[in-house]
Every structure is written in structure tokens, then in C-alpha cells.
Amino acid sequence: ISNINNLEEKKNFGSPKEVSPEHLTVYGFHDGSLHHRSLCKTRSGNYPYCNAMLLPSFSLAKSLVATMSLALLEKDYPNIMNENIQDHVPACKQKKWKDVRFKHLLNMATGHYFDKKWYSEDWYLNNKGFSLNYTHKDRIKFSCSVFSKKSPPGIKLSYHSSDTYILGVGLNNFYKSKNGDNADIYKDLILPLWKKLNLTQATYEIRRSIDAIKQPYMEYGMFMTTDDVLKIGAFFMEQNELTEEGVLADALQSNTNQRGLAAIENILYYNNGFWAKKFKGSGLNCAEDVWIPFMSGFGGITVAFMPNQTMYYYFSDNQEYSWDRAVNASNRMSPFCKSN
């Protein structure tokens, strides 16, 4: 690990013009071979054990657990994305769920929402007390009933953490139907991958419902270290059986025919549990526009995967989501596109 202040482009990573320094815990840039990292800050000064500092996933879990579960299951069950939610989540028995499939929940495109003008409605869930439903029974009942149907599934992006909870229940029940009642999708499917990637034990568990069911959350509830973030990122950026085709390939913008649903037209998109930002090619010395996939979490958490195999991340808590300067800096250090 190298101090990020040694980089020539240091002022463009964790830039105070993008993220308030007093709300920034840690940020880092991996240049393909070396990890350049800031100090780890707390409200009471620098944290001396930066390597071991636990960082919250918040919605990174949607990408790391929901998307990864489907990517792993897809190898054995190629049609998994088209499974009907009502076949696996009895609590969503209302007619409005009839045509909703796993893929619609992963893409936040159930057709259920409060108001079409928002692309994210987690603020509405907070107002209604979604996160205060600690038992599976209460949480699934809330999630299945909170929004009404406004359009057919698959068309409109309406981001809801409650939809990821429903998906997690559906996936866990699907997994149990194939592997027995004692099977657990986090313990039996996700955890072996984390162990293979040599992640810290911080990742070995995820938040669960507080009851006998112990339903694993997929919407948030993981912890990790900066090293875990890098190892997961390296896995996403390499060619492997999960990233080359299918759920994860689309999520990582490898499929130019499948960019995802627009959150902000021509700028921000959502695809299979990952976000993507579209950058004008002209600004990056590229012949075509550049799509950068990233994971995002509540408070101001970003993990972005650049086309030159570099990676930028920051964990902050003032709801600031800006990182264009890091993209431009990375491109100057190692151009995204071959110059003509």
C-alpha cells in the first residue's frame, strides 16, 4: 500500500470539490499493480489500524450478494432470471406480482412505485419504516405490499431496497428447493466465493432477520475492509466464467446492446444490480462514449471500475456521489482509449 498523496494526480482523488473532507473516511485508487490509499479518518482523528478498519456495505450488498447470487446460480440454472417471484415468495400473493420475475427485482423494474418522477424511492421506504421491520414475517409483508402497481414490469427504474429483500427471499427459497431446507444461499453459495478470493472474515456473515428463519438480507448489511474491496474489484475486472457472459457481464457493461434502465437519461443507468455512468468520449480522448460500471452505497460510497483496469473507491457519509475527477485522472495516467 502506498500513500495516495505520493501520486502526481493526488488532488483528483478524494477531491474536496467532490466530497467534503470532514465526511470522508477513506478513499483509494488501484492503478493495476499498486494500491494507493488515504489515511482512515474518524470523527475523533485518524484511525491507526487502517488495514483492519471495517467499512459498511450499505447498498454495495445489492451488487455483491444479489447480483452475485444470480450470476452463480445462472451457471446451473440458465433460466433463473425468468423465474416468477410468486413461485418462490408466497407472501407476494397479490395480483400485482403476477408477472414479476427475478430479473425485474434485480433491475428495480417491478412496475410498482410511489411516483414515476423518482428513480430512487428509498426515502419513501425510510418514511414508512422499512428498516424497522426486523423479523422476516414483518419485513416480507411490508415489502410485498408497500408499493402499488403503476406500469408493466421491466420498463421503469424505481430503486427500492425492499425489492432486493423480496429477491433475496425468492433466491434463498429457490436455492432451498434444489438443495434442501437447511441450505442457505449466503453460507453455501456466496461465502465459498469470498473464501476463494481470500477475503477477510468480516465478509463471512451478512445481516439477517431476527427470528428462527434468519433470512439473509441482500439489500445491505455487509462489512468489509479496503483490501476486500480491492480483491472483489479485481475479480470483477478479470476475465472469468462469471464476468464473460450473463448476469454479471451485463452488470459490468460488457454487453454494448444491454446498457440497463436509465436513471438520468444519457448519464446514469442501472443494470442487474450495478450502476453505470456514461461519459462523453470526446472528453476522454475516445472515439465513442465510455460507460463506467460502479457500485454505490448510502451515505456516499462509490466503487468504480475503469476501462483501463484501474479502480477508485471512497467511503463517506454526507450523501456526496461525485467522482468525475478521478475518472479523468485515471485516464491521464493510463489512457482508456488508444489515440488515433
Task: Enumerate the language-model features and the residues they cover.
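Non-transmembrane alpha-helical segments in soluble domains
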Residues: K103-L106, G168-N172, I190, W194, ...
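Short, gly/Ser/Thr-rich active-site loops of penicillin-recognizing serine hydrolases
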Residues: R325-N340
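A short, well-structured edge-of-sheet supersecondary motif
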Residues: I4-Y49, T302-F305
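Active-site SXXK
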Residues: P56-I80, L105, L167-L171, V229-I232, ...
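Catalytic-site signature segments of enzymes, centered on catalytic residues
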Residues: N46-L54, N126-R208, Y220
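Active-site helix/loop module of the DD-peptidase/beta-lactamase fold
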Residues: K75-Y113, V146-S148, K176-E219, E241-L242
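Solvent-exposed, acidic/flexible segments
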Residues: L54-S63, T67, P78, K95-D99, ...
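Penicillin-binding protein/beta-lactamase superfamily catalytic region
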Residues: D138-L157, N173-D181, T203-Q309, Y314-Y321
